[in-house]
């Protein structure tokens, strides 16, 4: 019913992008924690796997061994699909034997793609190839571009309904948590919401209390100045890339 990508980028940030013919997929599937890892739990989803998986990665357990232990304790593991990446970029994935075709996963350096009820294996391969080919993009946009590539390759064979993007960039709260719960074109809508977030939300979040600056920025003129700097930097970057 779903395909997703979980990734750790070169800056140590974590992200999950997911799309599905399943209402509000972002409420149950994607999970991440700064400095720890990212994961997606899907197919006949078991949301109870997420917390112990993150806890195990926080203890620097080997992801494949951790996942094996989690699945051994779940009598429904044959119906689950689960994949994750840790702070060292190590990935682990499971596609249960009772998951509905097409289903499967691929793991590459620092990321994993997994899906079920898909049009075919080309969906996860296109998603993975796109992510690998677009390292120059901002992390969130790179994830969205990969998701769109999977959609173009066939996506969920039942159709479209929901999509989500979750990114942690080193703080105890997400840098982005965008969800499209029910839409005719969820990935396009997710991209639109991401574009809207660039206007003020993303630069504003950089002014919030953080690990480095526990009180954040409270002077509104300084906040507006930061927003202007953010857009100036984006404009300069686009001109360099043109």
Predicted features along the sequence, with ranges:
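N-terminal nucleophile
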Residues: 1-242
